[in-house]
Amino acid sequence: FLPTDIAKQCYNEMSQHQDWMFDSMMGYPEDERDSQVNKWWTPYDTESKNRLEVDMPAVWKSLEYFNSRQFLMFLEKLTGINGLIADVDYEGGGIHRIKNGGRLELHSDYNKHPTQDMWRRINLLLYLTPDWNYNGHLDLCEKEGLVKVKSILPTFNRAVIFNTTDDSIHGHPTPLECPDNISRY
């Protein structure tokens, strides 16, 4: 990671959307980089989680690290939001798969956690598909999706962090144009 003071300065200098992008977020071994996520994918459930832990330990360790106190402290310093708490149940999170033709309408995420009395404050997206070149850019927008602030290519090991507010409109409204045997994660 960047030193926290430099990362925070850059984060604060971004648009009012307040986002930050890290390339090469985590160190993944080459054998986990080569689309292995496709071979074990099923909708997120306990069995999939257990297979992820065994088949892709670096990805699993990343998920654990994102919930660690050390990483939460980094996010607190980066964003200036104190008292962050990990969502260990991945409510609204986890690993998402999007196939050919898929898209995600522009939207803002819920702010209040559906089962706990907590506010959702930050989104972290980490892209896991190598050699991506099939649309599906993450669009960050303002004014209810009318003004695109940024369009981010979902390249492998790129992380995007942004505040979760009613105004943090995001999505990938342009459908993916990938071969049927490839999905975006």
List PLM regions with ranges.
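A structural signal for short, well-ordered beta-strand segments and their strand-loop junctions
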Residues: 1, 22-23, 85-89, 94, ...
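Non-heme Fe(II)/2-oxoglutarate
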Residues: 1-78
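Charged, low-complexity, helix/coiled-coil-prone segments
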Residues: 2-20, 95-107, 128-130
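Short, well-structured alpha-helical interface segments that form or flank functional binding sites
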Residues: 5, 9, 66, 70, ...
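Proline-centered turn/helix-capping motifs that create local helix->coil transitions or kinks
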Residues: 18-19, 82-85, 130-134
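Non-heme Fe(II) oxygenase catalytic core, chiefly the N-lobe of the double-stranded beta-helix
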Residues: 51-118
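Catalytic core of Fe(II)/2-oxoglutarate
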Residues: 96-97, 101-102, 106-122, 127-185
